[in-house]
Amino acid sequence: SGGFDFSFLPQPPQEKGVGLGPGPMGLMGPRGPPGASGAPGPQGFQGPAGEPGEPGQTGPAGARGPAGPPGKGVVGPQGARGFPGTPGLPGFKGEPGAPGENGTPGQTGARGRVGAPGPAGARGSDGSVGPVGPAGPIGSAGPPGFPGAPGPKGELGPVGNTGPSGPAGPRGEQGLPGSGPVGPPGNPGANGLTGAKGAAGLPGVAGAPGLPGPRGIPGPVGARGLVGEPGPAGSKGESGGKGEPGSAGPQGPPGSSGEEGKRGPSGESGSTGPTGPPGLRGGLPGADGRAGVMGPAGRGASGPAGVRGPSGDTGRPGEPGLMGARGLPGSPGNVGPAGKEGPAGLPGIDGRPGPIGPAGARGEAGNIGFPGPKGHAGLAGNRGEQGPAGPPGFQGLPGPAGTTGEAGKPGERGIPGEFGLPGPAGPRGERGPPGESGAVGPSGAIGSRGPSGPPGPDGNKGEPGVVGAPGTAGPAGSGGLPGERGETGLRGEVGTTGRDGARGAPGAVGAPGPAGATGDRGEAGAAGPAGPAGPRGSPGERGEVGPAGPNGFAGPAGAAGQPGAKGERGTKGPKGENGIVGPTGPVGSAGPAGPNGPAGPAGSRGDGGPPGLTGFPGAAGRTGPPGPSGITGPPGPAGKEGLRGDQGPVGRGETGAGGPPGFTGEKGPSGEPGTAGPPGTAGPQGLLGAPGILGLPGSRGERGLPGVAGAVGEPGPLGIAGPPGARGDGNPGSDGPPGRGAAGAPGPHGTVGPAGKHGNRGEPGPVGSVGPVGALGPRGPSGPQGIRGLQGLPGLAGQHGDQGSPGPVGPAGPRGPAGPSGPAGKDGRTGHPGAVGPAGIRGSQGSQGPSGPAGPPGSGGGYDFGYEGDFYRA
């Protein structure tokens, strides 16, 4: 019942007879020898993670680390081959010049590259040889050839005319920016003198070239527009909700190995444990391990010394411990130097298409009108009732087929021509990877200073200031009147030295000491409402590029302004001195969002910038539902190239009766590309219209101006696949009278046709609303240091901080000049008796005094004598 079972011990033989019960327990035998050392036990589990330690005090800032090794620039991939330039027109043949004088021949120059072959001219008829005419005037100098190697120095000839400059050579390859380890921030040094402007840094890595679009027809270059006045700044929008936390960044590289730790002190001796039972003999001895450090001897029970066994195997590394608790955030570091200008960012992803406007009413066909002047864009009208279907049109004649030209031979690579106008957009590629952080743009114009916000809360208590230097002594006061002299008192005994007297009245106020250390910056107050825009100032001289301002909200697209004349370039302003970088204060809480300001006036169209790098293809947009096909009217004569008409409302035609199939017309030339607008917001899902019957092709019209592209709607639901209609091969019918049939019933839903090719890029859509603030992405790599911007405007004066704690007592000041004599004091009290003075010197013997008068007669035998005036009787 829970006890030990001793049945395994040898039992005494059972004798029959009267049993007297079990005998007394025997004495315990002698203690056996200690058993052999047992095998090493298995490795223990790792203990739980300790509590996070208290954050240590912030150590002093380390010295500035040495400059890292210069980064090695890796030559980037060769840029894509540029498009060949448009071959120039053949020049006019010049008149033959008079034979010039032979100059000293130079050495033969290197052979220039062969230019792209121009178009072959028509072969002229063979002319007859005419008589030699008189020498013509001297022709103009041709373009200079490529420079040859220097020839031997000839005699100085007459100064020739300067030839035109040769074409620019191809641009060199861009190297990759070097990457060195970022050293720890050092203490901010004193402001140095303004150095000369350094050389430009290495250009950033060029993005991968996009797919080249088809070449567009070069249009005329528009005149440069006037720069419009900046509109008033809009108020700050409402703050978006906090985004979801971004995904964890990639694991950083492992840090460098730490220094080898010192050997810790020996632990205290453990208390002696109870003697365990003798262990069984352990297993096979392990391989010789590395000898461990011998610890201090423990105080055990005295037993025979055991034989030291061989060292055990080196243990396997334990399982990784649990991740410790997150440490407290560190103090903010010093402000690092400003970064250099980073590489240009990749273009952003196109936004979602905007909503489809309501369909306008279908109008009757009018006569062909003359092109009117361009009006403003009209608003979309309400959808009208469905009108009756018009008559089917006549079948047009097929256009003549063009002749196929011969394939030209590829010429050598010509000098890259100027950038042509952008061609129509190709089909959208898949969404590219998110680009790196864009470069900091140029700073925005400095806005008018808004009204001061409400005072923020008091800042933290500042550190005690430095003790001021002692002040100078005040002016001497007027002298007091001398008092009456008192009687001389008795000299008292010398008293013991008294204690220090009470502290005197405070002296004159000293000069103000140096300014104390700047206290901690208080939290920023709530932002005040934006002030009204000030009047436009006169244009200043051009200053240095300031730091990048925050991106403003996009205003609505303004109408294109009239092209103006190009203004003269202003003079470059002087570079301001670098200001001292102040400590970074804590981030203040965001103020309430102000109301939206009125929309600013539309800005004029700015100058065209240089062509940018080819961006990655954007993500493919979703295809909207196909609209119903209208009935095609008879082809009219080709009109003149009309002016650009107003943007009409989007119509929704009725499904008409099917006309006979027409022949395929000639492919018209591509329209001029429209300018790309910002993406609109996604529209509602449109209904899937019934497919219309193919109409007759119209005659080839002249190239029109690009129309305004409507917003792409969301894709509609898939319709039920209808049976395909058979295609007829009828001959052209005769012109019948125009009938007016009733509206045909809608046909069954056809199968969804293949996706059409992308049309020309439409006009800019309406500006989409600002989306919510996206999740904070991982921090990109630090860009190169940018040029230091101009010194900013002085900030508002901060609130006075709390009074600092009293500083330590300063050193004693120099002794001031003696003050004026005070009034005579009252008679003092009798002093203590003075110490007994030393014995005086014995005086000299006095001279003999005069004889005294005769004494009375003596009494027998005596005589009288005088001594110093005293009478003695002998």
Swiss-Prot record:
Positions with biased composition (Basic and acidic residues): 566-575
Main location: secreted
Residues the record marks as carrying a glycan: K93
Annotated localization: Secreted; Secreted, Extracellular space; Secreted, Extracellular space, Extracellular matrix
Keywords: Extinct organism protein, Extracellular matrix, Glycoprotein, Hydroxylation, Pyrrolidone carboxylic acid, Secreted
Biased composition (Low complexity): 27-66, 110-143, 188-209, 218-236, 247-257, 346-365, 434-451, 463-473, 491-538, 545-565, 583-593, 614-623, 663-697, 705-724, 745-755, 763-778
Residues bearing PTM 5-hydroxylysine: K93
GO CC aspect terms: extracellular matrix; extracellular space
InterPro entries: Collagen, Collagen_superfamily
Residues where Allysine is found: K16
Region (Disordered): 1-874
Alphabetized Pfam families for the sequence: Collagen (PF01391)
Record PTM text: Prolines at the third position of the tripeptide repeating unit (G-X-Y) are hydroxylated in some or all of the chains.
In-chain residues carrying the UniProt-annotated modification 4-hydroxyproline: P10, P13, P34, P40, P317, P320
Tissue/organ expression: Expressed in bones.
Keyword Cytoplasm: no
Biased composition (Gly residues): 237-246, 474-483, 603-612, 648-662, 725-744
Further details from the record: These protein fragments were extracted from an ancient pelvis bone collected in Newburgh, New York, USA and estimated to be around 11255 years old.
Similarity comment text for this entry: Belongs to the fibrillar collagen family.
Function: Type I collagen is a member of group I collagen (fibrillar forming collagen).
Subunit record text: Trimers of one alpha 2(I) and two alpha 1(I) chains. Interacts (via C-terminus) with TMEM131 (via PapD-L domain); the interaction is direct and is involved in assembly and TRAPPIII ER-to-Golgi transport complex-dependent secretion of collagen.
PANTHER family in the cross-refs: COLLAGEN ALPHA, COLLAGEN TRIPLE HELIX REPEAT
Name under which the protein is recorded: Collagen alpha-2(I) chain
Organism: Megalonyx jeffersonii
Upper lineage: Eukaryota, Metazoa, Chordata, Craniata, Vertebrata
